[in-house]
Every structure is written in structure tokens, then in C-alpha cells.
Swiss-Prot record:
Its main location: cytoplasm. GO terms for molecular function: ATP binding; metal ion binding; threonine-tRNA ligase activity; tRNA binding. This is Threonine--tRNA ligase. PANTHER family: THREONINE--TRNA LIGASE 1, THREONINE-TRNA LIGASE. One of its GO terms (cellular component) is cytoplasm. NCBIfam families: thrS. Catalyzes the attachment of threonine to tRNA(Thr) in a two-step reaction: L-threonine is first activated by ATP to form Thr-AMP and then transferred to the acceptor end of tRNA(Thr). Also edits incorrectly charged L-seryl-tRNA(Thr). Residues 174-474 are annotated as: Catalytic. The gene is thrS. It comes from Mycoplasmoides gallisepticum (strain R(low / passage 15 / clone 2)).
Length: 573
């Protein structure tokens, strides 16, 4: 599929270049969602009404059956052959890749983001464009705006129609679209890009998730702490984040007294300060800390996407301070925490990655091969003890240590990291925070930190749940669990209110629909709004108020249960 998308991207470049020889191309990308192409033109102002005309031009190019050759060239040659594309060359040179993919058709050269390609234009016979809009060059709002064209190409119409059905399903599962129904969160430019505002319904969901995860943390021996959202710049210099992570942090805040502060992008340094609050002995360990931590990370404005990519997020963070002889036990324990929580939310691991450092990349990773060898071996041994299959991913470690990434395949076939276990010998070192403990022999030894991410941030996790469930959240998690609907307001409304009092007394989230509408319309409206339970009150229910007639979301048939058994449906995990 990617080879057809990549070839379609090439063919679009050819068509646009023919229509405007002076066109300038910018960023372009190909993935399993299709391709996008950024361009700048004085004459081509493409809008959705032009898509059919563009598709006809592509069909003619397909019929011309032009052979395509692909070659890999070094940067010097790429700069020569693409000399009329300054924006594209700026991106290529900044990427610092040693080689560049160039396609050649009829002695014209075109850049392509990947090497997968079909060898003739006649092989791509079906095209579609999803959207056209604006995009800042390099995703930076201070740069010029280019036109971004999104589309895809396939070998025939049948394959494309199948793909279009998948695209429609993606739209239905988009958490931003679902949010318009459930009203969980909002954004406002006055609050700032990427700064989510949780609405009442969203705060209910967020709090329920937190309460459950906190109960599991407590069961496994974690102690909650609370630390500031700001830290002195020296704290992040000491931890190493300032040197390795500065581009992803918000700028420094200069205070009147001369101190420089920064919004924290993570809590690890603060939790080290908790450990250092007093001397620790061998019997104090392991010390397991947890915190719902508000973090700020500077994401490029072009990359902000609903709750998936934000600048302010709350991480359910965990750090385990332990001895060397406790590492394996604590990793096994951390895995049990993850397994229990993820299972409750009906998620399954698609793949487990052992993320390792790249020994050839001294800038992105701490330069201490002995530390890397030790920590990577420890994590791999733990995975083997658990009997888990895993894939090694070189270059995907955190800058300070290796990690185990638990990947979930979403309903839209996206692979996302939900949970992580990271082993850290760097922050505890003498050069950093000097995390030590007194041994039985009254000597001091260096401790170890295990970073544990159970579900990541509330923001991304809620986005994942909405996508997985299509907004039909589990009954215990739904912000509005049930609605009571009278068959006739004048006759049955009082009975609805009496049942409402009983259910509210059981701490259930229930409302009465007293609108002056037809019964079928009320039922349909609450189905659209994904209310898990609809309770119908008519003459029979008034005669027997302890017998509940209800219908579950997505079901046509009604059910009946006695009130006490009905309430058990709402039980929390």
C-alpha cells in the first residue's frame, strides 16, 4: 500500500510541476493514512472543487505509462538536482540524512520521503483527495503558510473503495468528533494552543480513571506525593533534561530576584528531591512514589491534535527507588500493575518493545556504555523471566536509560505506546542526584530508579478509550450512566423522579428526560448521545416500582431486573 501512496505522491508532484513550473515544494510525508504534500505557488490555488479535475489529470498521467526510476543519492547531488526547490532542500539538509531518495521520470527529478515505489505510472489507477488546507513551513507559526494537499492512490477502484470505508470508520472513531457528542473537553485560543480545558463530563471520566488507577497503585505499595509544576533551571541542568530535552521544554521564566524557573516537562527530578528529603537505609527500599503530575511540553503548533498531542498534560507518574538486588522483583511487580490496569480497560498488548540506545548517537543518549550495557541486560532478563515476546528497537530509549514499551493496536490499526517501564542508573549517579542508601554494613551504595508509566497521561489515554469504544464507554466510566424516560409526562413523570431519588442515593449518574417530545425521539436522541442505559417508566413500571425496564446502548430489546440487581450493573471495578 505504501508503495502506491508514495507513487501517487510523485505523480501529484509531476502534475503540479507541469501546471506551474516555478512551484516550490515543502514538507511531504507518506504513511498508512495516505500522503500529504506542501507546496507554494503563485498560480495554483487548489480547493476541494478542483479535486475531480486533478484526478482526471492523474488518470491521463496513468494512461501515459511513463516508467519511473528510483535512485539514492548523497546530499551533494541532491542539492544539485533539486536546486530549484529551496524549501525542500532546507528540510533535507536539516534532516542530516546521508542519502536522499530521488525518482526520475522523463529526465525530471523528484524527491520522495521513502524508497518504496512502483516502476510505472500506469500501475496507479485510482486516486482520491481527502482535504486541502494550510500548513506552516516546518510546523512553525512564524514561518510562511504553504498549501497542504492530502490524498492517496491505489492499484484499482475496488481497493480504494475498501480503503474509503476504513477512512469513514476512522472519522466515526475520531475522539474529537466523539467529543462533540459527549462534551468532555474543549480548547480556546485565549487559554493557548494545546491547553485542554476539561468540561464537567470530562472531569468525571478523568476522576473515575484516576480513582481506579490510584486504588491499584495503593494495592501495590505506591505512596502519593505532590510536587510543584515549576522547577529551578538548575534542577533540570542537574538532571540532564536541560541539555537533552530543552527544545521540548517551555522557555525559562526570569524572576525579579534573579532566579530562573521552568515549567516541568516531567517529575523525575522532583521525585529525586523527595528521596533526598532524609537519609535512606536499605530497609527503606523499595520506595514507590506516585503523582498525578501536571506537565508542560512544547509541541510544535502544527503537531497539536486534540487530546493526543497537547502542551499541557497530566501524567499518572510513578518512580520506584530500589536496590540493585530488587530490580528484577520491582520490574515484575510493575508489569503486574500494568497488566491489571490495562485489562480493566479492555485493552490488549499488540507488541512489547525493548527500546535500546544507539551506541553511535552520542548526542541523543548519555555517553556511558557501561551503564547502558548493565541496564539493558537487566530489562531483557526481566522480559525473559516473564516469558514475554519482545522486539528490540535500537535508538528508541530515553536519553537516560532503556525502557520496555507496551504497544497497543487501536481500533484504527494505529500502534501507540500506552505503558512503559524504564530503568535508570543515570539520575541516581553521583554526577546527578547521588541517590544512595546505607547498607547493613553501614556503607553506602548507589540506588536505582525505575520509571513506571501505567496509562500515560489522562489526555492521551482518554483519546485512546474514545477511539477504541467509539464513545460508548463502559457503564462504570460513562459521565452520564442512565436516563429515565417517562412514556407520558403527565402520567409517569412523578414515578421517574421517585426512581431518580433512589438511584442518586446510590451515587449513580442519572437524569430524567422530561422534554415534551415523543417517546421514540427521546430514545433515539439518547442512543445518539451514547447513554449506556435507558430506563422506561410506563403504567406497568408504576404498578411495580421495584422492577426496572431498561435498554442498553446499541440494543433493540428491553430487559427487566429487580432494582437491587439492576444497581449491581453499575458496579465499579
Amino acid at each position: 500500500m505504501l508503495n502506491y501512496f508514495n507513487t501517487a505522491l510523485l505523480m501529484v508532484q509531476m502534475i503540479l510541476k507541469k501546471q506551474d513550473p516555478s512551484i516550490k515544494f515543502g514538507q511531504m510525508s507518506v504513511n498508512d493514512q495516505g500522503f500529504y504534500l506542501d507546496y507554494l505557488s503563485q498560480t495554483l490555488n487548489i480547493n476541494p472543487e478542483d479535486f475531480n479535475k486533478l484526478i482526471k489529470s492523474l488518470a491521463k498521467l496513468c494512461s501515459s505509462a511513463q516508467p519511473i526510476s528510483l535512485k539514492t543519492v548523497d546530499l551533494k547531488i541532491a542539492n544539485q538536482l533539486l536546486s530549484d526547490q529551496p524549501y525542500l532542500l532546507e528540510l533535507i539538509n536539516e534532516a542530516k540524512e546521508k542519502t536522499v531518495n530521488l525518482a526520475t521520470v522523463d529526465n525530471h527529478h523528484y524527491y520522495l520521503p521513502m524508497a518504496q515505489l512502483v516502476d510505472n505510472t500506469k500501475l496507479v489507477k485510482a486516486f482520491n483527495f481527502q482535504s486541502v488546507g494550510g500548513a506552516y513551513f516546518k510546523g512553525d507559526k512564524d514561518n510562511l503558510v504553504m498549501v497542504r494537499l492530502n490524498g492517496f492512490g491505489f492499484e484499482n477502484d475496488k481497493v480504494m473503495q475498501d480503503y474509503l470505508e476504513i477512512i469513514e470508520e476512522q472519522k466515526q472513531r475520531d475522539h474529537r468528533r466523539i467529543n462533540k457528542i459527549l462534551e468532555l473537553f474543549t480548547f480556546n485560543q485565549l487559554a493557548g494552543p494545546g491547553m485542554p480545558i476539561w468540561l464537567p463530563n470530562g472531569q468525571i471520566v478523568r476522576q473515575l480513571i484516576g480513582d481506579y488507577v490510584h486504588s491499584v497503585q495503593k494495592k501495590f505499595g505506591f505512596m502519593a506525593v505532590n510536587t510543584p509544576i515549576l522547577g529551578n533551571v538548575d534542577l533540570y541542568k542537574k538532571s540532564g533534561h536541560y541539555n537533552h530535552y530543552a527544545k521540548d521544554m517551555f522557555p525559562e521564566l526570569a524572576l525579579l530576584d534573579g532566579d530562573k524557573m521552568m515549567l516541568r516537562p516531567m517529575t523525575c527530578p522532583h521525585h529525586c528531591l523527595v528521596y533526598l528529603n532524609k537519609p535512606r537505609n536499605y530497609y527503606d527500599l523499595p520506595m514507590r512514589l506516585s503523582e498525578d503530575a501536571l506537565l508542560h511540553r512544547y509541541e510544535a503548533s502544527g503537531g497539536l491534535t486534540g487530546l493526543e498531542r497537547v502542551r499541557a498534560m497530566t501524567l499518572l507518574d510513578n518512580h520506584i527507588f530500589c536496590r540493585l538486588d530488587q530490580i528484577k522483583t520491582e520490574i515484575l511487580n510493575a508489569y503486574q500493575v500494568i497488566k491489571e490496569v490495562i485489562g480493566t480497560f479492555n485493552l490488549k498488548f499488540h507488541r512489547i518493545d525493548l527500546s535500546l540506545h544507539d551506541p553511535n548517537d552520542k548526542q541523543s543518549f548519555i555517553d556511558n556504555e557501561q551503564m547502558w550495557a548493565r541496564s539493558e541486560n537487566q530489562l531483557e532478563d526481566a522480559l525473559k523471566d516473564l516469558g514475554l515476546e519482545y522486539t528490540k528497537q535500537v535508538g528508541e530509549a530515553a536519553f537516560y536509560g532503556p525502557k520496555i514499551d507496551f504497544q497497543v493496536k487501536t481500533a484504527l490499526n494505529k500502534i501507540i505506546t500506552v505503558s512503559t517501564i524504564q530503568l535508570d542508573f543515570s539520575l541516581p549517579s553521583e554526577e546527578k542526584f547521588d541517590i544512595k542508601y546505607k547498607t547493613k554494613d553501614n556503607t553506602y551504595e548507589q540506588g536505582v530508579i525505575i520509571h513506571l508509566g501505567i496509562i500515560g497521561t489522562y489526555e492521551r489515554f482518554v483519546a485512546t478509550l474514545l477511539e477504541q469504544t467509539k464513545g460508548a464507554l463502559d457503564l462504570w466510566l460513562a459521565p452520564k450512566q442512565a436516563v429515565i424516560i417517562p412514556v407520558n409526562n403527565s402520567v409517569h413523570l412523578e414515578g421517574c423522579n421517585q426512581l431518580l431519588e433512589k438511584l442518586l442515593a446510590r451515587d449513580l449518574r442519572v437524569t430524567v428526560d422530561s422534554r415534551d417530545e415523543r417517546l421514540n425521539k427521546k430514545i433515539r436522541d439518547h442512543q445518539v448521545n451514547k447513554i449506556p442505559v435507558q430506563i422506561i417508566i410506563g403504567d406497568n413500571e408504576l404498578k411495580n416500582p421495584d422492577l426496572i425496564t431498561y435498554r442498553l446502548y446499541g440494543q433493540e430489546d428491553s430487559n427487566q431486573l429487580e432494582l437491587t440487581k439492576f444497581i449491581e450493573l453499575f458496579k465499579k471495578p
